[in-house]
Amino acid sequence: MEFSPCIVRTKEPMQALAEIVAKARQAVSAAPDLPTLDELRVRYLGKKGELTGHFKALDQVSAEERPIFGKAVNEAKQALQSEIEARRKDLEQAALEARLASEAIDVTLPGRGLDVGGLHPVTRTLARIEAFFRYAGFEIHEGPEVEDDYHNFEALNIPPSHPARAMHDTFYFDAHTLLRTHTSPVQIRVMEHQGPPLRIIAPGRVYRCDSDLTHTPMFHQVEGLLVDEQVSFTDLKGILSDFLRAYFEREDLEVRFRPSYFPFTEPSAETDIQCVNCSGEGCRVCGHTGWLEVLGCGMVHPKVFEHVGIDSERYLGFAFGLGVERLAMLRYGVNDLRLFFENDLRFLRQFN
């Protein structure tokens, strides 16, 4: 918008100057925004502004009053410029506050939920098992999942005619290389490099050709070994009973040992616990027997010691093996082993 300069000829120049200054100050103080303020600055202080135009009124003033009038016009321009700058700062601050207010986050509003991860039930179960045996003085050892026939079978007194060597039970790469069917080879490797006394557990993945409600081609095992002088089956029963009662958090849990057969232990036993679902009354989970089979165990066979160079006349030992998924199913009430490997978040979130 362009304004014509105002040259007052009917009023005294000083009076006209005072009126314009008063009008300008009032307009500046009432300016609602920065664009309006800029228009006022141009209107009054621009090259063709109303205050600037008053310099042309100097010829209406006597020579004696001309310096006084010129000084008054300059002072009026400076004062108005200061008021415009002050008003500009106020408007800029108000605009900043308005913008901040519009961008403010209302912390009282409900937030967006975050997906929080958690430990897999098999991982939780492994951690509980390892914690108990670490407390009992056992070391944790690991070994290769791709094994040779010697460490997986022969060194464990499993003859070539044993069913475990059949193609339908074992994943073979060639005649001498396979995916380990248990973590017992770790025990052989440790005994080959460390002498007694030994207390170790070997957790890890194992592989067998099997798949149904209670079996998968890949699952987790923890196998344990203790070798020392004067070791008895009573020691084996004591450590396993303590473990099972600690794992299921039941001091009154009944544990029984049944005679069994494993080629790498003699004598051998299957370990059962009172059904944790029905407390021994009989239900679908335990097949109405009141008992659940949970692990196998026994005293280390002398031929196993011979393969690793340990004197079986001086040293005795016991070994045991348990399925991690089996214990997880019993602890968490899961009836299908395959659920652990389907990556269904609806299932997994129940444990976090």
From Swiss-Prot:
Coiled coil: none annotated. GO terms for molecular function: ATP binding; magnesium ion binding; phenylalanine-tRNA ligase activity; tRNA binding. It is an enzyme of class 6 (ligase). It is found in: Cytoplasm. CDD domains: PheRS_alpha_core (cd00496). It comes from the Bacteria. Its cofactor is Mg(2+). SUPFAM superfamilies: Class II aaRS and biotin synthetases, tRNA-binding arm. This is Phenylalanine--tRNA ligase alpha subunit.
